[in-house]
């Protein structure tokens, strides 16, 4: 999934140049930045249980965005979980973490889709 609050990604992820080229800076093009941060800024409309599985060192979709979304959903009493995999990036390389991800997916599906 993409970053839910792109404002938190500015300067924290690897895409700063692309952001500036495509949508400008947050201070020069605030309206657009708020629009693309829609999921976080409209968290009060989310009712779907949510599972965040994130690498601690993910520079593609930084941890901060998942932490913010998780906290917002917890505050709103939406069922949500945040699992952070230490030392991992966007793609996990530790076999036990990959196994854990699959087990968590299956448990989540069993709980919320059955």
Model-derived features: where do they sit?
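Active-site-proximal cap/loop segments of hydrolase catalytic domains
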Residues: 1-114
